[in-house]
Amino acid sequence: MRIKPDDNWRWYYDEEHDRMMLDLANGMLFRSRFSRKMLTPDAFCPTGFCVDDAALYFSFEEKCRDFELTKEQRAELVLNALVAIRYLKPQMPKSWHFVAHGEMWTPGTGDAASVWLSDTAEQVNLLVVEPGENAALCLLAQPGVVIAGRTMQLGDAIKIMNDRLKPQVHCHSFSLEQAV
């Protein structure tokens, strides 16, 4: 199923579920990964889905196509990215979990990034939501990962210093039939 932003979408905070929500106006609701303690005061006033939200939606949607995720997972990642960029409180970097690299990469909004866990050298895929001069707010762009005993799930937020981030390399495999 493909979702498409429209003027009837509404942001609101749901007390019962303790989550930021998006009413998709067609009987569907999106429940974000973010609870009250993670949200700015603006999140507690219902508001419409604006033109800037729609522009970011399409930008994130396009940039997320290269992630090895299902359509449903990509939609969830994109909508969580919108919540994060609009309503998430500032976070402190948690970079000590990741390997530092010699060079500093400055990512852009929507870039696919990778980091490597310090303890296992496992690669972790991220979506850059809010880049900064020294660190970037990212969302986990894979179904899950365990970092220092804590399980993170698709769409969870983490801020990481730029010297830990690297651009994600996308390897596309093609069959002989596709090449001909």
UniProtKB/Swiss-Prot annotation:
<protein>
    <recommendedName>
        <fullName>Cell division protein ZapC</fullName>
    </recommendedName>
</protein>
<comment type="similarity">
    <text>Belongs to the ZapC family.</text>
</comment>
<dbReference type="InterPro" id="IPR009809">
    <property type="entry name" value="ZapC"/>
</dbReference>
<keyword id="KW-0131">Cell cycle</keyword>
<comment type="subunit">
    <text>Interacts directly with FtsZ.</text>
</comment>
<keyword id="KW-0717">Septation</keyword>
<dbReference type="GO" id="GO:0005737">
    <property type="term" value="C:cytoplasm"/>
</dbReference>
<dbReference type="Pfam" id="PF21083">
    <property type="entry name" value="ZapC_N"/>
</dbReference>
<dbReference type="GO" id="GO:0043093">
    <property type="term" value="P:FtsZ-dependent cytokinesis"/>
</dbReference>
<dbReference type="InterPro" id="IPR048373">
    <property type="entry name" value="ZapC_N"/>
</dbReference>
<dbReference type="GO" id="GO:0000917">
    <property type="term" value="P:division septum assembly"/>
</dbReference>
<keyword id="KW-0963">Cytoplasm</keyword>
<comment type="function">
    <text>Contributes to the efficiency of the cell division process by stabilizing the polymeric form of the cell division protein FtsZ. Acts by promoting interactions between FtsZ protofilaments and suppressing the GTPase activity of FtsZ.</text>
</comment>
<dbReference type="InterPro" id="IPR048372">
    <property type="entry name" value="ZapC_C"/>
</dbReference>
<dbReference type="Pfam" id="PF07126">
    <property type="entry name" value="ZapC_C"/>
</dbReference>
<keyword id="KW-0132">Cell division</keyword>
